[in-house]
Each structure stands twice: as C-alpha cells, then as structure tokens.
Amino acid sequence: MKLENMLNNKIKDLKPSGIRRFFDMASEYKDIVSLGVGEPDFDTPWHIRQEAIKALQEGRTFYTANAGLKELREEVCVFTEGRHGVKYDPMHECVITVGGSEAVDISMRVLLNPGDEVIICDPGYVSYVPAVTMADGTPVILPLKEENQFRITPEDLEAVITPKTKAILMNFPNNPTGAVMGREDLEAVCEVLKRHDIIVVSDELYGELTYTGKPHVSVVEIDGMRDRTILIGGFSKAFAMTGWRLGYALAPAPIMEQMYKIHQFAIMSAPTLSQYAGVDALRNSEEDIVEMRESYNQRRRYLVKRFKDLGIPCFEPFGAFYIFPNISQFGLSSEEFAMRLVEEERLAVVPGTAFGDSGEGFLRISYAYSIEDLKTALDRIEHFITKLRNEK
C-alpha cells in the first residue's frame, strides 16, 4: 500500500507556509538575528498569569461549555460594545476558539459550498487561502497596492466580484503590511459589499494596535454591516498571549448556530485555564495595552525613519507591528534579497512573496523586538545594501 495514495489530494496540493519554509532554511545558520516572527516580545502580564494559576490551584481544569465560559463570552461582548458600540448576545452570538485561526477556519466551513468564491486580500496572512481551499471554496485574489497604502478601494473590489462571490476575508490592521482602513474607507467598501450581498469575515486581531491617534474602526460599526459580518478577535497580540491559544468569533445567531457545531465536533472547547486568564485580560489590561502599544509605536517610528534615511521606500504603517519596505530598486526578488540577508548578514526577515504574489519586491519586518535588536538589524541591512549599490 502506498500511503501517499491514501491521502486527500486537496491537502497534498497545499503549499507549506512561506514563512515556515523560509525560517526552516534560515535556522541552518548560526548567530542569526531574526525580525521574522509576529509574536510580542512582552511576557503575558502577571495578573493574567496569576488568574490561570489560581484556576489551576482551585482545580478548575475541566471542560467548559462548548461555546466557552459564559463569563468569558460575556466579557468579550462587553469589550466589543465598549470598543465599537455594537451589542452581541453572549449566549447565541459568541464562540471562544483556539486562537483566531480556528475562528477563520470554522467561518469558512460554515459559509462555503463547493465553488463559492471568497475574496482574499494579497498580500495577506498565510492561512487564509488554505482555509478557503480546505472548505471547498475558491480563493479570488484582490491585489492591494502600495500607492493606495495597501487599502481596499471600491474600484479594485468591484473588479474581482463575480456572481459566485460569497464572502470577503478582510484583515485590518493588516498582516503583513501594517495598513489600516479608516471609517470613510470602510464605508465606501461596505457600500459595494452590501450592493452585491457579500458576507464579510473580518479578522481584527490587531485592533488594539493602531498608531493613528484614533481608535480602530471595525467593519461592524458601519451601517448595515453588523448582521452580515463574522467578527474575529483574539488575545495573542494585544495581550501578549500567543501560547495561550485563545480567540473568539462574533456573528449573527443563524451563522453562530452552525459555527457551534463545527467547534463542538472538532475542538470540544478552548483550553479552560486560558479562558479564565482571558476573563482577567479583558477586565484588567487597559494599562498593559497602552504600555505595549506605546513601545511598539516608538519602534515603528524608528524603523520608518531609518528606512527613509537609507533611501528605501517604505509606506508608513499605522497598525499591527509590521513594516513592509519596498526593496525592488536592488534588482533582486524578495526571496533572493531575504536569503542573501541570511547568508551574508545573518539577519532573517520574511520575503513579501510569503504573503502572496503582490508581496514581490517587499519584505515583512516585525518590530515586536527590542529597540536594540532593531538597531542591530538595520545596521546589517545598511551594510548589505551598501554592498549591493557598490556592485552596480
């Protein structure tokens, strides 16, 4: 028996994550400085850890309700209403998931029938196309352009809509570009979506990390969008809780009823200790969020200025903790540039093409690292591009 003949062809055809493939190669080198991982360099705040320790000591280690702790679902809904002014029923419109990635996955499986099309922004997070494909949907790529600050425009959106379009999977603040969508931008795009009766799956995991001086605007705040949107959030980025694997989804009850089924059969419930920690995170972390956001903003400003001084075009990101410089002037592909950085400078960043074809000519650099690491990394980039310019 050939085991490869026993496997699902659709899964076999999926390509591994471009990020993981690149870092597997980079890991072969010693003394690497990495700006590649999208993970906060802060420890989970102590008061959050204490709540999990307390739950463990008290023996609260059993399954929760499939949809999640009632207390946590209530806090998610309170948090969302406080941030966006939109109400959800914690008993029928909220599910606690194993990270935001599970929420994306079950959203696609709930919505899609074979042949349904889902619009996906490119560059975009690496799991979106596989999530659509595994749910028997058809990914349709919406290129995001540097001249539009990597935002969706109504014109570009109209160009990719077909009679088969079922949904759009949006991610703002955006990974990998750091782009944000303001209220006017969203209103214009949502008019197109409403006119074509398209569902929105909005991954807003980085919603607490914006640097415009104004709060993040959610899709669900736009008139008429609350009841055609699955809103996805989580704890990994804003609360420095990546390893706790905790996220959530909010959606109208008819959609959520079906999401509960998949979550129940595939997961049972999110990790119990993580859920108790999540309750404390939502109640008591405002100062922690502000502190981390201010630190990221300092690093963001440093990188923007440094790239400008180096003569490398770099649109200014106002969200998440990534910067997306344009290195096309050097005549190397994104992957060639990134690989030579590893080989010659012992610096690991992510080639833009890991996030789709529209990432060609760009690099994704995470500033979820210390300012000292960022300075070291930019010194190495400066040394490298000086060599490239001298080669010409």
Cite the ranges covered by each PLM segment.
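Conserved N-terminal alpha-helix of the aminotransferase class I/II PLP-enzyme fold
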Residues: 63-98
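PLP-dependent class I/II
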Residues: 2-7, 12-14, 22-29, 33, ...
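Phosphate/diphosphate ligand-binding glycine-rich loop within oxidoreductases
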Residues: 53-57, 61-66
